């Protein structure tokens, strides 16, 4: 079929996709969260911003004439015999065009490669754990850092929210910059590789097959594409992508599979061109892990230091380049240590030799108590003296080695260890088993002593729970006590796979202990702790006008029988009862306010029967006042 037909259908499908999206959101988002389902348009699972939409519409109109010219040129080529020359352009020859499918717009990149995140409460514990594993996968190979959003931190105003929307798997590309932006993980999308792919869009990646030079590496089989989905195979404009010196990556986790949007599972929509040497078509569309090209590209996009890395294990060691030999001057190395929330980090130096200077100005090692360069400074070191051991206040440390040109030193060597447990004096936070969300380590014992401000109690809510099962929990377990002593009252000992009920202390202290033996290891647990107060014990009962019911982390207002809660959630109003007229198999419902004093009149034929909301049948109606057998309410019935 004529290529013009496919170009036209593709253009129409793309325009339609930009103007409509059918479906209702599964998870309601607040107005200040940008939902990808309400985007101006879509390219596959990519949600387009209004700016993206305008750019694509302008480009679509501009390229329509170019499509026609290209067709004419190809026809002329066939008649002149030059078509054979075009076909002989190999992949190797095309490598001179280095364009990568990542955002070219600096404002779309996350500041200092830090991406704050939230996870909606509608996800299960195993899903939340998998999201964290996907984020750790990106952290493990790049300088990108995912941190749980702190609403009090203005640096976290721009953040992502994992949610479940009607668009299924979809996300914006890069940072929108106007507050919260949703990452939809819909039905059948909650798989590790798919989430890593969606996070690729968050980082700033477009789909690999949309690069401007893609036609040199893959062919699009238009006739096999589902009608209306042709726009997903458009080539991006060079203004949207950055030329970072990387060639086409068939192995990218951002690449479509051969049958994506295909009319049939065995029909190709994208066909990789054969390797000129082996004659084999490369595999595409993997959803297992970041490719080497993905890793290189992300580090180039965020200008990650070439020296250093992110350390995610519970224990480890690291050193300056070439240790114990001298490393070259004029280097910047950054190490990011991240352990399980609820743990702290013990850092010890085993060797240290840097060129000294006043204030350690030229060559230094800096250690910061947090996830980035703006975290509180724990120390700046130089010279030949071994620094004292360092203990973090939380689960992250940031270490930077800076050396000036023409100054050579041996550098340093250090090891670290995650310390689980400890004293916690915060109003809220998270406790997790060591190595969570991966399996916990054997032979571990962690004791957390939580203290809240006076006049508050401690609330504990488990989000996920998978501990080796035993009838009496003698092997691996989580134990909670109402106080800080081993002799404090036992609230419960938990193991197995069922999430324990919410827990609260009677005072402002709680002890949480995790124990694992040397054999079976499971996924562990994640629990949120927070300050808890009995609002119902306050003089105003939390504002409730009738009944106050205290719950973990909150409270609710309720009403006595015969009353119902008003729209403000605090006051009670006289309840309405439903009465039914039952006749000839038909039950029309009448909503009649329940009288406290006085009467209500219901009219009907003598053959009708009257029942209350409890469906207790009365005698045939007569002209008299009747007391209902199932209620004390007086009703006047007239015939």
Curated annotation (Swiss-Prot):
In alphabetical order, the GO MF annotations are: calcium ion binding; metalloendopeptidase activity; zinc ion binding
Cite the active-site annotation: 198
Q: In which tissues is it expressed?
A: Ectodermal and primary mesenchyme cells in hatched blastula.
**Is Repeat among this UniProt entry's keywords?**
yes
Instruction: Output the superkingdom of the source species.
Output: Eukaryota
Pro-peptide residues, renumbered to this chain, are 24-109
The family database entries (InterPro entries) matched by this protein are listed as: BMP_1/tolloid-like (IPR015446), CUB_dom (IPR000859), EGF-like_Ca-bd_dom (IPR001881), EGF-like_dom (IPR000742), EGF-type_Asp/Asn_hydroxyl_site (IPR000152), EGF_Ca-bd_CS (IPR018097), MetalloPept_cat_dom_sf (IPR024079), Peptidase_M12A (IPR001506)
Which key words tag this protein in UniProt? Calcium, Cleavage on pair of basic residues, Developmental protein, Disulfide bond, EGF-like domain, Glycoprotein, Hydrolase, Metal-binding, Metalloprotease, Protease, Repeat, Signal, Zinc
Annotated ranges, domain Peptidase M12A? 100-305
Cellular component aspect of the GO annotation: extracellular space
Q: Which residues are glycosylated?
A: 122, 140, 317, 455
Q: Name one Pfam family in it.
A: FXa_inhibition
Task: List S-S links within the chain.
Answer: 143-304, 167-189, 169-170, 307-333, 360-382, 420-446, 473-495, 536-548, 544-557, 559-572
Where do the EGF-like domain residues begin and end? 532-573
Cofactor(s) it depends on? Zn(2+)
**PROSITE patterns found in the cross-reference section:** ASTACIN (PS51864), ASX_HYDROXYL (PS00010), CUB (PS01180), EGF_2 (PS01186), EGF_3 (PS50026), EGF_CA (PS01187), ZINC_PROTEASE (PS00142)
Q: Where do the CUB domain residues begin and end?
A: 307-419, 420-531
Entry annotated with the keyword Zinc: yes
EC numbers on record: 3.4.24.-
Cofactor stoichiometry and binding?
A: Binds 1 zinc ion per subunit.
Binding-site residues, Zn(2+): 197, 201, 207
Q: Which residues form the signal peptide?
A: 1-23
Gene Ontology biological-process entries: dorsal/ventral pattern formation; protein processing
UniProt-recorded name of the protein: Bone morphogenetic protein 1 homolog
